[in-house]
Regions:
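Short, charged juxtamembrane terminal tails flanking transmembrane helices
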Residues: 1, 129-137
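N-terminal membrane topogenic signal
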Residues: 1-11, 45
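Alpha-helical transmembrane segments of integral membrane proteins, especially early/N-terminal helices
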Residues: 8-19, 78
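Active-site and channel-lining beta-strand-loop segments
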Residues: 21-51
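Membrane-associated feature with strongest affinity for ZDHHC
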Residues: 22, 46-126, 135
Length: 137
């Protein structure tokens, strides 16, 4: 299995950690829990919740890596899916770090997730077609 392909999702998680750490000291203890498209915050959450975003991203990468070790034909699809999920988590962190002033991050999340799922499905379909072609010969 090509371990270098996991560089991209791990890099995304690292960027997420770096972005949070760069802003950590300037963040108040309580942050808005969500924003609307005009940047108005609502609800509150402790800033420590931000640490969950890269941890969840790393967990997603780890689970995808373990599954890919078992099903090597799905490796590319799992890397795409893990990268997409990590990008969505990074986008969520960036919405909070920019105090909701950059709604492009919120708008990008469904597009990123849809593209990641589509990429994963395409890889699954492709691997099944190869499997059927091998069986029929």
């Amino acid at each position: 299995m090509n371990k270098r392909s996991w560089f991209i999702p791990i890099l995304i998680v690292a960027i997420n950690v770096l972005a949070i750490m760069m802003r950590w000291c300037s963040l108040s203890e309580l942050l808005p829990a969500h924003y609307d498209l005009e940047g108005n915050g609502g609800g509150t959450m402790p800033r420590s919740v931000l640490l969950l975003y890269p941890l969840i991203g790393a967990a997603v990468c780890l689970v995808a890596y373990v599954i890919a070790r078992m099903k090597q034909k799905l490796q590319t699809g799992l890397v795409i899916l893990a990268s997409g999920i990590c990008l969505v988590l990074l986008s969520s962190a960036m919405v909070t770090l920019t105090a909701g002033t950059m709604p492009v991050f919120m708008l990008a999340e469904p597009v990123i997730l849809l593209a990641a799922v589509a990429g994963f499905v395409a890889c699954v379909v492709k691997s099944r077609k190869k499997k059927k072609a091998v069986i029929s010969h």
